[in-house]
C-alpha cells in the first residue's frame, strides 16, 4: 500500500496499544514525554520509510 496513508483501523488490539502508549508516559516529566514522543515518532517514520505516507500523515495530523 505504498503512497497511501491508511485511515481505517489497522490494529488487532487497539486498546492494548493505547494502554501501552499511556503506560510508557507514566512517571515522565513534560519534557521527558516530549523527548519520548520525538524518539517514538522518528522510529516509526523510519519504519514506515515511505515519504509520501509520512507527508500525508503530517498533513492529517495538523491542527
Question: Which role does the model predict for each range below?
Answer:
Residues 39, 62-63:
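Residue-level signal for alpha-helical context at structural boundaries
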Residues 10-11, 43:
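General helical structural elements
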Residues 24-29, 36:
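Active-site flanking loop/helix segments enriched in acidic
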Residues 2-6, 12-16, 23, 31, ...:
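N-terminal intrinsically disordered, cationic/polar leader segments
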Residues 35-52:
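Short, charge-rich amphipathic interface segments used for partner binding and complex assembly
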Amino acid at each position: 500500500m505504498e503512497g497511501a496513508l491508511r485511515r481505517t483501523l489497522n490494529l488487532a488490539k487497539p486498546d492494548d496499544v493505547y494502554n501501552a502508549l499511556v503506560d510508557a508516559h507514566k512517571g515522565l516529566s513534560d519534557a521527558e514525554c516530549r523527548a519520548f514522543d520525538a524518539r517514538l515518532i522518528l522510529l516509526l517514520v523510519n519504519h514506515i520509510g515511505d515519504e509520501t505516507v509520512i507527508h500525508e500523515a503530517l498533513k492529517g495530523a495538523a491542527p
